[in-house]
C-alpha cells in the first residue's frame, strides 16, 4: 500500500492574497479551488484518512468541500470554531476522492479587534489558510 500527503494553500504569503481589512467580524474567503484538471491522479480514486486545517490568530472557521462532475459531494471537514492553539488532524467525512474531483477550501476570519490590516505570511501575527490531507 502507498501513502502520501498533499495540501491546498489558499493564502500563505503576502504575494498570494491582499491583506485582510481590520474591523470585520466575519470575513469569508473562498481561499482555494483545486480544479478537476489538478486531480488527474494515476489511480481512479484515493482514500483520505484525515484533514488538518491551518490558519493563524484571526482564523475562525475553515472547511474543505468536494464537487464531482458538477455535483456537490460534501464536506471533508468543517471546523466551526478554529483555535490556533489547538490544531488537530481529523477524520475526513468524504473518504474517497476520485480522479477529477474539485476541492474548495474556505476560510473565515475575525479581524474585529484589529486596527490595521492583517497580511498573509509566516509569522503568527500574519495569517494563512491551508489544509493538509493524509
Locations of regions flagged by a protein language model:
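Beta-strand-centric surfaces of beta-sandwich/beta-rich domains
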Residues: 1-134
Amino acid at each position: 500500500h502507498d501513502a502520501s500527503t498533499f495540501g491546498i494553500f489558499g493564502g500563505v504569503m503576502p504575494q498570494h492574497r491582499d491583506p485582510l481589512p481590520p474591523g470585520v467580524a466575519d470575513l469569508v474567503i473562498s481561499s482555494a479551488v483545486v480544479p478537476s484538471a489538478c486531480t488527474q491522479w494515476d489511480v481512479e480514486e484515493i482514500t483520505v484518512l484525515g484533514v488538518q486545517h491551518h490558519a493563524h490568530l484571526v482564523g475562525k472557521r475553515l472547511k474543505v468541500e468536494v464537487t464531482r462532475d458538477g455535483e456537490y459531494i460534501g464536506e471533508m471537514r468543517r471546523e466551526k470554531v478554529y483555535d490556533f492553539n489547538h490544531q488537530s488532524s481529523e477524520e475526513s467525512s468524504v473518504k474517497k476522492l476520485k480522479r477529477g474531483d474539485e476541492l474548495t477550501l474556505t476560510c473565515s476570519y475575525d479581524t474585529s479587534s484589529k486596527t490595521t490590516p492583517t497580511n498573509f505570511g509566516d509569522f503568527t501575527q500574519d495569517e494563512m489558510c491551508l489544509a493538509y490531507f493524509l
